[in-house]
């Protein structure tokens, strides 16, 4: 009900965020959603700070962002699964660019393995990249936001953080953890009177990026695989409207509501109906 009311309100927002002058840091900016979000923000007067381990891809994002109108773009090599490197690069950003005012945590990975195929190291590394990286970046950049009671935390979670999915136990666990983390941080900020700091949690279905490895939906009318450019436009719009949740497509809303009262067997039947296991096997089973 809250999500429905929030979306109705966001159709007619009282105000929209102005991006001019914001310092926006994006993790995982070399390709996919992170790259497209950077390109969408480029003409809006922001300073872009791009973090990725793919140096060439990140340089290309920077070039395209400047081509799109960005006047200030800073590129950093950062392995977000490495705590020391995150804090080291965060110090550099503060000294060379300034305090980050919009933090977009987007770096992530999806292995697409079954639970018994995943090694302990697989689980640890997925949690480091997808979840712990967001803890470390929030710890690095949130204090400055708190000091001035202004800022925006944007976390790319997933519909998989709301629904446990086939061949994605490590991924689902990490994305569910992100949702819990960001809801908790938002609660603490609110009750401490720091209501100028906004939070947006992004929960998409599959998006056509390297991460999805050619995943194809068997029921595209209900569960489309979004183009990254379209997804990025929705994300930027959600930030502009200061939405707390962006869940897409609408069918994910329905499933989230249904699992709270339907028998588990019915949920599994719905998974079979949309042929999700078959889609995952086709995309990841051959790896």
Labelled PLM ranges:
Residues 10-49:
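Canonical Rossmann dinucleotide-binding motif of NAD(H)/NADP(H)-dependent dehydrogenases/reductases
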Residues 46-60:
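Conserved glycine-rich Rossmann-like NAD(P)H-binding loop of the short-chain dehydrogenase/reductase
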Residues 55-56, 76-88, 120:
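The beta1-alpha1 cofactor-binding region of Rossmann-like NAD(H)/NADP(H)-dependent oxidoreductases
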Residues 114-115, 119-124:
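Substrate-binding pocket helix/loop in short-chain dehydrogenase/reductase
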Residues 138, 174:
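Active-site helix of classical SDR
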Residues 158:
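Residue(s) in the substrate-gating loop at a strand-loop-helix junction
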Residues 188-252:
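SDR active-site lid
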């Amino acid at each position: 009900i809250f999500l429905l009311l929030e979306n109705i309100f966001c159709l007619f927002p009282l105000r929209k965020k102005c991006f001019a002058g914001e310092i926006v840091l994006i993790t995982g900016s070399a390709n996919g959603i992170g790259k497209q979000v950077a390109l969408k923000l480029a003409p809006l007067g922001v300073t872009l700070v791009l973090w990725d381990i793919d140096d060439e891809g990140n340089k290309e994002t920077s070039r395209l962002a400047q081509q799109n109108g960005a006047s200030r773009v800073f590129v950093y090599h950062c392995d977000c699964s490495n705590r020391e490197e995150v804090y080291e690069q965060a110090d550099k950003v503060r000294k060379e660019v300034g305090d980050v005012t919009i933090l977009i945590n987007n770096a992530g990975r999806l292995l697409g393995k079954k639970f018994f195929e995943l090694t302990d190291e697989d689980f640890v590394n997925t949690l480091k990249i997808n979840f712990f990286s967001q803890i470390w970046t929030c710890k690095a950049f949130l204090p400055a936001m708190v000091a001035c009671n202004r800022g925006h935390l944007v976390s790319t979670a997933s519909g998989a953080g709301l629904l446990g999915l086939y061949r994605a136990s490590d991924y689902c666990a990490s994305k569910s953890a992100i949702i819990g983390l960001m809801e908790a941080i938002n609660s603490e900020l609110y009750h401490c009177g720091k209501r100028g700091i906004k939070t947006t949690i992004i929960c998409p279905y599959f998006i056509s990026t390297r991460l999805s490895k050619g995943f194809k939906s068997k029921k595209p009318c209900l569960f489309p695989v979004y183009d990254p450019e379209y997804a990025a436009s929705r994300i930027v719009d959600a930030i502009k409207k200061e939405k707390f949740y962006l869940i897409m497509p609408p069918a994910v809303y329905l499933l989230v509501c249904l699992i709270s009262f339907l028998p588990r067997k019915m949920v599994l039947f719905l998974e079979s109906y949309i042929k999700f296991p078959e889609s995952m096997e086709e995309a990841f089973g051959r790896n």
